[in-house]
């Protein structure tokens, strides 16, 4: 199947310079390999509010999986490569960096300096989750969103652990609430149990399921049409 990067270069890249404002999109591994549709939708939304979308010169995995498994040296190499591209985007191209993954954004903003000892103070505030970026534009009155009025649905929102640490769940929730005819249920979220790569490991399966049990019960009880979250591993 086609990666998001391949799709973007073939179908979207050529038209992005037509917009008056621009951002760089840190898509991450999940969008690139597992769910390109989310990346395509992100491009559509940003284009709709007048922003051209560009890829970073070189994007590596944010490194969170390496950090979680103690592979600090490898994670540091990837972080340094990402920050080189981020600095080029921000300082040379004058483009802030947005992402759709709370985990990737938290890692790049907070875990690079705290866990890897890499100074990102010069760019940290220009690395942002897309929902916060869009919310700020709406609050400033710079853009307006147009919605279809023929969609009625019940959505349950789960706050991921990294989103909780960022303190940015408010922005995703506010955007969902702004959609007409959406009945939004904000779950009393605890960890889903996957905990990065922890829950992928066979020996951790029972513990992982136990951690997520409360969240799973809530999701079943609210019987929503969709469950929304900003984290790929929670999904």
Per-range role (PLM):
Residues 1-235:
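Iron-sulfur cluster-binding electron-transfer modules in prokaryotic oxidoreductases
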């Amino acid at each position: 199947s086609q990666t998001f990067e391949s799709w973007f270069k073939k179908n979207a890249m050529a038209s992005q310079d037509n917009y008056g404002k621009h951002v760089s999109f840190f898509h991450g591994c999940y969008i690139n390999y597992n769910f390109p549709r989310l990346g395509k939708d992100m491009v559509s939304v940003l284009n709709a509010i007048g922003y051209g979308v560009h890829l970073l010169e070189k994007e590596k995995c944010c490194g969170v999986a390496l950090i979680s498994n103690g592979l600090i040296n490898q994670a540091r190499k990837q972080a340094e490569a990402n920050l080189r591209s981020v600095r080029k985007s921000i300082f040379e191209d004058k483009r802030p960096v947005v992402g759709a993954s709370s985990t990737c954004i938290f890692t790049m903003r907070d875990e690079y300096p705290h866990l890897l000892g890499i100074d990102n103070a010069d760019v940290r505030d220009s690395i942002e989750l897309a929902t916060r970026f869009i919310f700020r534009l709406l609050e400033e009155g710079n853009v307006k969103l147009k919605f279809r009025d023929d969609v009625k649905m019940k959505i349950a929102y789960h706050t991921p652990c990294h989103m909780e640490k960022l303190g940015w769940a408010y922005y995703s929730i506010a955007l969902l609430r702004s959609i007409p005819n959406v009945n939004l249920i904000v779950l009393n979220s605890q960890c889903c149990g996957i905990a990065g790569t922890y829950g992928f490991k066979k020996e951790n399966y029972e513990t992982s399921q136990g951690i997520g049990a409360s969240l799973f019960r809530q999701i079943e009880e609210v019987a929503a049409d969709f469950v929304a979250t900003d984290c790929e591993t929670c999904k």
